[in-house]
């Protein structure tokens, strides 16, 4: 099998890594950076941009620039009411699912499709580094992602043309990277605060065994929320001074968001940050500017509620692991948002331990995913990973109650069977409502979907016996099987109605992505060809001017003719002619260059007998491979 890459598909930034020579290596993207912004944009020319280049143009193109899409993946519209208000692009309902609106293409995208473009770029950049096509990956997800979100992430990989060998929890991946060389047993708590999600996992690591004892988290808490409190502060301050709410203007909102992120980062190392946004808006009186100083103390005051929310999952994870903070050996900090001083202080206060900041918080998750990829590919030996399901799974029973079949923090993979019966006499079918969550009432938990089992022989209520089996694989993804013991009927049930895509939708998106990838490649090749042609036209003109009379008239005329024709092909965007004329002009320039060198060589040969000692010394003695010393000669007349 080929190389298996590990991908951290983040809310804000993503990262890709691979095992090389038994060690994980983070792969830089085509732009030379080790992390890639999880941003996809479409320009007015309908060109697709991914990564840094997409992020840079967001202010001028807020409607068609998609970021923080991970917060929508695998979710229903009614689950993302707050998140949808915080982005500059349109978030729409498609059935019960979420779609993002792209006005310039006049179409909607599923979050999986947008994430797939980020995954595709990471895989392509990794392929260029490795010198082979990347087709297999391990992709990370927040530990607290539910079944729908995990399945949606796997679908995104499929749309990107990747075989997703494993979905692995982000804190577990970080623990793999941290504990790979640990021989002695350690109990560690991984505190993972990323751009859009927050996870806490407690693990026992040592001698190649990584056992997750518990996990907790909040999928509605991350760096984006810290940015938002700054955005709101800036907007409210400006509104009180000028009477204008900048959040109603998409371009202004995008500028505020970028300024907030920059200020948040600065405040991790400085005690105050200057925020200057000239020409943020305009009124009949003229342009308006935003100029404000944000102190670290004010930021911590604004974010106090968010910081306090980080405490609850830590306490819950320790409680579920049946450990006290004094029994922990290390607190491993993961995710860019853990650089916030108030977050570090909270961890220290809650656990009475200094956080371990030896790992790179932006890269460690991808590194762990690469290690897991190495395990699956057989490159890494003697690693045993025991992960858990983050949320309880069950079914709705009589009275709207959730009956749990698999409780949270159960080691996966796992399988559990329960027997249920009918609620009324003569019932020939049952509808089973599959749920995920911790609340007592079905309506308060996440609905993963419903299915019907038909063909039950009529009988008094309570007599039929229906076996329902929940099976969670190593990815944490659920499948359900039902069997009527009376009739012997057994069938695997595909859960429908969940906030994920159907197989046919995924297949269609795979084909669309492949077609678009081909079209994008062709478009890039044309742009590269045009750039080469324009460069050569400029070089030809410059070269002819510099050489002047040294070029024979016939040769110069041929170069000028080819250069003019190539310029005409560029203007007409005739790419076939461009390719041919590019090669022809290059050939003419090679001929001119060779002719000029021959002339100079002949002139030099004729001058040698004249007794120029310096020239004789430089060109005379010895091997052609001898060092050549640069020198200036003055011609004596």
From Swiss-Prot:
Disulfide bonds: none
Keyword annotations from UniProtKB, A to Z: ATP-binding, Chaperone, Nucleotide-binding, Phosphoprotein, Stress response
Biased amino acid composition, Acidic residues: 624-637
Residue ranges, compositional bias (Gly residues): 603-623
Cross-referenced SUPFAM superfamilies: Actin-like ATPase domain, Heat shock protein 70kD (HSP70), C-terminal subdomain, Heat shock protein 70kD (HSP70), peptide-binding domain
Gene Ontology molecular function, alphabetical: ATP binding; ATP-dependent protein folding chaperone; unfolded protein binding
Pfam families, per database record: HSP70
Record bears the keyword Isomerase: no
InterPro entries (alphabetical): ATPase_NBD (IPR043129), Chaperone_DnaK (IPR012725), Heat_shock_70_CS (IPR018181), HSP70_C_sf (IPR029048), HSP70_peptide-bd_sf (IPR029047), Hsp_70_fam (IPR013126)
Induction entry: By stress conditions e.g. heat shock.
Phosphothreonine sites (modified residues): 197
Renumbered residue ranges of the record's region Disordered: 602-637
Function summary: Acts as a chaperone.
Family, similarity comment: Belongs to the heat shock protein 70 family.
Protein name according to UniProt: Chaperone protein dnaK2
Lineage: Bacteria, Bacillati, Cyanobacteriota, Cyanophyceae, Synechococcales
């Amino acid at each position: 099998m080929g190389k298996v890459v590990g991908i951290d598909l983040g809310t804000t930034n993503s990262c890709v890594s691979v095992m090389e020579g038994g060690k994980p290596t983070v792969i830089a993207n085509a732009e030379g950076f080790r992390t890639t912004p999880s941003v996809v944009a479409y320009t007015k020319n309908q060109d697709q941009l991914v990564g840094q280049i997409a992020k840079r143009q967001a202010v001028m193109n807020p409607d068609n620039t998609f970021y923080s899409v991970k917060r929508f993946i695998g979710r229903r519209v009614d689950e993302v009411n707050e998140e949808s208000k915080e982005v500059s692009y349109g978030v729409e309902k498609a059935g019960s699912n979420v779609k993002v609106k792209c006005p310039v293409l006049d179409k909607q995208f599923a979050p999986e499709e947008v994430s797939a473009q980020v995954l595709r770029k990471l895989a392509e950049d990794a392929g260029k580094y490795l010198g082979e096509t990347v087709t297999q990956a391990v992709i990370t997800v927040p530990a607290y992602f539910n079944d729908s979100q995990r399945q949606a992430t796997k679908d995104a990989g499929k749309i990107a043309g990747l075989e997703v060998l494993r979905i692995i929890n982000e804190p577990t991946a970080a623990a793999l990277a941290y504990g790979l060389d640990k021989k002695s047993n350690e109990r560690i708590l991984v505190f993972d605060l990323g751009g859009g999600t927050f996870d806490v996992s407690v693990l026992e690591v040592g001698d190649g065994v990584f056992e997750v004892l518990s996990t907790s988290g909040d999928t509605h808490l991350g760096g984006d929320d810290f940015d938002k409190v700054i955005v709101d502060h800036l907007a409210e301050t400006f509104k009180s001074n000028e009477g204008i709410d900048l959040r109603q203007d998409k371009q202004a909102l995008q500028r505020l968001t970028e300024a907030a992120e920059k200020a948040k980062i600065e405040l991790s190392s400085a005690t105050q940050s200057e925020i200057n946004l000239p020409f943020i808006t305009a009124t009949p009186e003229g342009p308006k500017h935003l100029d404000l100083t944000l102190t670290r103390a004010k930021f911590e005051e604004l974010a106090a509620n968010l910081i306090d929310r980080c405490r609850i999952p830590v306490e819950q994870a320790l409680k579920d692991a049946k450990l006290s903070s004094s029994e922990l050996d290390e607190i491993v900090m993961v995710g860019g948002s853990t650089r916030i001083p108030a977050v570090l202080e909270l961890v220290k206060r809650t656990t009475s331990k200094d956080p371990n900041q030896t790992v790179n918080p932006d890269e460690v998750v991808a590194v762990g995913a690469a290690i897991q990829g190495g395990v699956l590919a057989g490159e890494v030996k003697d690693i045993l990973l025991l992960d858990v399901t983050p949320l309880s799974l069950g079914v709705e029973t009589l009275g709207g109650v959730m009956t749990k079949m698999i409780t949270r923090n159960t080691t996966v993979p796992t399988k559990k069977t329960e027997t249920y019966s009918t609620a009324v006499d003569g019932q020939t079918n049952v509808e089973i409502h599959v749920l995920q969550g911790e609340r007592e009432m079905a309506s308060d938990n996440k609905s993963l979907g419903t299915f019907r089992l038909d063909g039950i022989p009529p009988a008094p209520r309570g007599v039929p016996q229906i076996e329902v089996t929940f099976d969670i694989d190593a990815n944490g993804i659920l499948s359900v099987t039902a069997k009527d013991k009376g009739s012997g009927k057994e069938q695997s049930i595909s859960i429908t109605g969940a906030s994920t895509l159907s197989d046919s939708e995924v297949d269609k998106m795979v084909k669309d992505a492949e077609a678009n990838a081909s079209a994008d490649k062709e478009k890039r090749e044309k742009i590269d060809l045009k750039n080469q042609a324009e460069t050569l036209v400029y070089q030809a003109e410059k070269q002819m001017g510099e050489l002047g009379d040294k070029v024979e008239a016939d040769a110069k005329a041929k170069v000028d003719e080819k250069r003019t024709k190539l310029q005409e092909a560029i203007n007409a965007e005739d790419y076939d002619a461009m390719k041919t004329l590019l090669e022809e002009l290059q050939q003419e320039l090679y001929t001119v260059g060779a002719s000029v060198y021959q002339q100079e060589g002949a002139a030099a040969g004729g001058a040698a007998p004249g007794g120029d000692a310096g020239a004789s010394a430089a060109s005379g003695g010895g091997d052609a491979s001898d060092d050549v010393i640069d020198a200036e000669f003055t011609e004596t007349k």
